C-alpha cells in the first residue's frame, strides 16, 4: 500500500511520521484491495486539550474511506483513527465479497 503522510503547517519529525506509517501499514491485513492512504497531521491551537488531529483517506476500488480523529497526541490520534479505519475497511471487504 502506498501512503502519504503530510504534516499541515508544522514540521513533523521523521520518527513521528515513521511510527504513524507503521501503524497504518497494518491495514492491508484487513483488506488487501487498499490502493493507497493519505494521512494528514494537524496541530489545533484553538483547544487546550485534544489539540492533535489526524485525517485519513483510504483509497479502495469504487469507494474511499475517510476518518478524522482528535487526541492529546498524534500517536494516540493515529491509533484511534486506525481502529476506526480497520472497522470500515473490513466492512468494505465484506460488501465486495457479497457482490
Regions found by a protein language model. Name each.
Residues 1-99:
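N-terminal, polar/charged subdomain of small-to-medium soluble alpha/beta proteins
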Amino acid at each position: 500500500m502506498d501512503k502519504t503522510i503530510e504534516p499541515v503547517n508544522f514540521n513533523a519529525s521523521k520518527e513521528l511520521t515513521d511510527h504513524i506509517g507503521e501503524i497504518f501499514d497494518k491495514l492491508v491485513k484487513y483488506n488487501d484491495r487498499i490502493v493507497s492512504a493519505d494521512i494528514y497531521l494537524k496541530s489545533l491551537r484553538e483547544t487546550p486539550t485534544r489539540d492533535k488531529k489526524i485525517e485519513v483517506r483510504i483509497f479502495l476500488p469504487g469507494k474511499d474511506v475517510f476518518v478524522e480523529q482528535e487526541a492529546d497526541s498524534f500517536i494516540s490520534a493515529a491509533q484511534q483513527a486506525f481502529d476506526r479505519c480497520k472497522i470500515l475497511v473490513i466492512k468494505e471487504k465484506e460488501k465486495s465479497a457479497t457482490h
